[in-house]
């Protein structure tokens, strides 16, 4: 049996940095990444056979817990009939219909294979439909790794302390206006200066890639009003929050309806599925109907769609989100109470099945505030919890995720471990 360290050393010889997505490398927390061999329910097991309670959840998709038997069965049954056809299937139509039925802002939707594809194409669609070039995004919000969006981004870029990426020509981001999240006045000023040039505003309606930052009261409604007034397209990037925070995503919780929505993660049930959709008049600009090009060999892949359909059916059961939200809130509140009892500066927040942990005196409301949190304290907390069998994201700038299988016993075990760790942090 190989150890995690041996596997990481081997991986580094053939894969850049030893990983296929940078945050997995543990660079921001130090130490050796855990190589996962299997997962079931709320647990993962590493290459050395150690079991962990998992709050990474494949970075969001595992809302039902890992390897849910009905999802696994759906994948197996689909795979028997073929892995990929490069042609339309009834299943992809069914998934599209299901997404439209669940999200009132969707009139039409197209399936892709990732969140990056979804956001990249939504931006292209907004530009093509409006004939404008400039876009507004927000500092710390991550919308995938397409060139024009790698400006003051969150997720891996924030983890590594890089506000943008090498290899992106200045011309590619010349039309991107990065503004402060939750600062509606800055958006108003940008529209006052560039209104006739702005194609769209893209936003994580709850930011989950600079830890968890909720929208300020009136922020999303204000974006809706400004986009309507200036003829710009409002895009909600619900790749992370879609069907994770509630049955209709953030737009269902707030009542703010975007023009376009991007989705991924949960809708694939752990398989590579993304989607973008919205107003039919906008979607009519996508090929083969219009002149905005988009294509994909594996878009609507039948095996991935089978996982998505099974997941979407299960999360649609009555009471699902009430139970998920209650467990997530219990975890966040329990962690905050134990930190406070230990005298450790710490805050926690939650929405639906997502939570944020911050080593600071209050819950941050912006990129600047989350950047000021104590990352060294987080590193100590992360490793001490990992030693006790609790698997949090290896970055102070990533949200955490609870699944339907995180029952009271799992939450209690997590809080017991955290109580021990907070006592050591105080010392």
From Swiss-Prot:
Catalytic activity: (S)-4-amino-5-oxopentanoate = 5-aminolevulinate
Pathway field: Porphyrin-containing compound metabolism; protoporphyrin-IX biosynthesis; 5-aminolevulinate from L-glutamyl-tRNA(Glu): step 2/2
Cofactor: pyridoxal 5'-phosphate
Gene3D superfamilies linked to this entry: Aspartate Aminotransferase, domain 1, Type I PLP-dependent aspartate aminotransferase-like (Major domain)
Pfam families xrefs: Aminotran_3
Cytoplasm is among the record's keywords: yes
Keywords: Cytoplasm, Isomerase, Porphyrin biosynthesis, Pyridoxal phosphate
InterPro entries: 4pyrrol_synth_GluAld_NH2Trfase (IPR004639), Aminotrans_3 (IPR005814), Aminotrans_3_PPA_site (IPR049704), PyrdxlP-dep_Trfase (IPR015424), PyrdxlP-dep_Trfase_major (IPR015421), PyrdxlP-dep_Trfase_small (IPR015422)
Cellular compartments per GO CC: cytoplasm
Enzyme class label: isomerase
N6-(pyridoxal phosphate)lysine found at: 265
Keyword Nucleus found: no
BP-aspect Gene Ontology terms: protoporphyrinogen IX biosynthetic process
Any one GO MF annotation of this record: transaminase activity
Localization (cell): Cytoplasm
Known EC number: 5.4.3.8
Family of the protein in this entry: Belongs to the class-III pyridoxal-phosphate-dependent aminotransferase family. HemL subfamily.
Complex and partners: Homodimer.
Name of the protein described by the UniProt record: Glutamate-1-semialdehyde 2,1-aminomutase
Species whose genome carries this gene: Bordetella parapertussis (strain 12822 / ATCC BAA-587 / NCTC 13253)
Gene behind the chain: hemL
């Amino acid at each position: 049996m190989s150890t995690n360290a041996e596997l990481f050393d081997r991986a580094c010889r053939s894969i850049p940095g030893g990983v296929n997505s940078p945050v997995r490398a543990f660079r921001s927390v130090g130490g050796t990444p855990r190589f996962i061999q299997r997962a079931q329910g709320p647990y993962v097991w590493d290459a050395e056979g150690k079991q962990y309670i998992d709050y990474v959840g494949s970075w969001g998709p595992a809302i039902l817990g890992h390897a849910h038997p009905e999802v696994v069965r759906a994948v197996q049954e689909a795979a028997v009939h073929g892995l990929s056809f490069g042609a339309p299937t009834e299943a992809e139509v069914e998934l599209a219909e299901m997404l439209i039925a669940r999200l009132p802002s969707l009139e039409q939707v197209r399936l892709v294979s990732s969140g990056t594809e979804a956001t990249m194409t939504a931006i292209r669609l907004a530009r093509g439909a409006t004939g404008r070039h400039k876009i507004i995004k927000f500092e710390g919000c991550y919308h995938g790794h397409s060139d024009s969006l790698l400006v003051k981004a969150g997720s891996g870029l924030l983890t590594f302390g890089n506000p943008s990426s090498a290899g992106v020509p200045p011309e590619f981001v010349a039309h991107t206006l990065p503004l402060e999240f939750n600062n509606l006045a800055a958006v108003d000023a940008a529209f006052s200066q560039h209104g006739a040039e702005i194609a769209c505003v893209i936003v994580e309606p709850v930011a989950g890639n600079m830890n968890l930052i909720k929208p300020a009261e009136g922020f999303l409604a204000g974006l809706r009003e400004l986009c309507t007034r200036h003829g710009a397209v409002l895009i909600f990037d619900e790749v992370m929050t879609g069907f994770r925070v509630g049955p209709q995503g953030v737009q269902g919780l707030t009542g703010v309806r975007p023009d376009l929505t991007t989705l991924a993660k949960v809708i694939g049930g752990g398989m590579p599925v993304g989607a973008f959709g919205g107003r039919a008049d906008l979607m009519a600009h996508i090929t083969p109907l219009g002149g905005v090009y988009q294509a994909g060999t594996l878009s609507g892949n039948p095996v991935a769609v089978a996982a998505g359909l099974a997941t979407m059916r299960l999360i649609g059961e009555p009471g699902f989100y009430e139970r998920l939200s209650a467990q997530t809130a219990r975890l966040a509140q329990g962690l905050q109470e134990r930190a406070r009892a230990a005298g450790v500066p710490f805050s926690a927040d939650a929405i639906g099945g997502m939570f944020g942990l911050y080593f600071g005196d209050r819950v941050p409301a912006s990129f600047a505030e989350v950047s000021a949190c104590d990352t060294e304290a987080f590193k100590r907390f992360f490793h001490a919890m990992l030693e006790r069998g609790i698997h949090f994201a290896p970055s102070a700038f990533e949200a955490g995720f609870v699944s339907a299988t995180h029952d009271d016993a799992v939450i209690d075990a997590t809080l017991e471990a955290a109580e021990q760790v907070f006592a050591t942090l105080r010392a």
